[in-house]
A protein has these predicted regions:
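Structural signal for short hydrophobic segments within the conserved structured cores
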Residues: 28-29, 70, 123
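Residue-level recognition of the GNAT/N-acetyltransferase active site
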Residues: 44, 115
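Residue-level detector of Asp-centered blade-edge/turn motifs that repeat once per structural unit
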Residues: 45-46, 91-92, 139-140
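A flexible loop/linker signature enriched in serine peptidases of the S9 family
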Residues: 1-19, 32-38, 48-64, 74-82, ...
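Generic structural microfeature
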Residues: 88, 139, 160-163
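A short helix->beta-strand "capping" segment at the edge of beta-propeller domains
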Residues: 22-30
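DHp/HisKA histidine-phosphotransfer helix
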Residues: 85
């Protein structure tokens, strides 16, 4: 067997403008082939970096120009050896929201954030003891939506859970704006335009 690796693909002939129907595609490995499993790539919002999962448990980022690789989150937050975990870049490219296995409570996942520069600690945002999954940045990166089964029928015997969509705010201002009624929100928008 082989190992999973990450490749870029582009149309080889300039006259072919439609990727799905191109007759010749050029593939190039993003990193040299190794014994490490690399998969689930996501380009950074500015397109200069590529995040990926390595060995099914680590969140890594490669600078596409220099090919320098940094670790963002190590394997102490993942105990599964299946097909990785869900993660997503923040809109400004400075953070990741990701699923983690907090407190070795496998298989139950929590939602966490970690700095994309690889220098910060992973911060567990949910710590629920139930399945929290599928984080998505919303409100221009000021909040994260995620699925949770903490309030529905719960998965106590490995079957039959229900999930709700939850939101966690990254700052007080985003929370305060979210709580405004429609009339107050419109007044706030007018005031912000006037000040700008």
């Amino acid at each position: 067997g082989g190992n999973w690796n990450i490749y870029t693909a582009k149309i080889a002939r300039e006259e072919e403008v439609n990727f799905p129907n191109a007759t010749l595609i050029e593939e190039e490995a993003v990193l040299p082939v190794s014994t490490k499993e690399r998969f689930a790539p996501q380009f950074s919002p500015d397109g200069k970096e590529l995040a990926f999962i390595e060995d099914r448990t680590k969140l890594m980022v490669v600078d596409l120009k220099t090919k320098k690789v940094r670790q963002v989150a190590d394997d102490k937050y993942q105990y599964r050896t299946g097909d990785g975990f869900t993660y997503t870049w923040s809109p400004d490219g400075k953070w990741f929201a990701m699923e983690i296995i907090g407190n070795r409570h496998d298989p139950y996942s929590d939602i966490a954030i970690v700095s994309a520069d690889g220098k910060g600690e992973v911060v567990n945002l949910t710590n629920s003891g139930y399945f929290d999954s599928n984080p998505r940045w919303v409100l221009d990166g000021n909040a994260i939506l995620f699925s949770s089964e903490r309030y529905g029928m719960r998965n106590h015997a490995s079957w039959g859970s229900l999930q709700d969509v939850m939101i966690v705010f990254m700052n007080q201002d985003a929370y305060d704006k979210f709580r405004l009624n429609k009339e107050d929100y419109e007044l706030l928008k007018e005031e912000e335009k006037r000040i700008a």
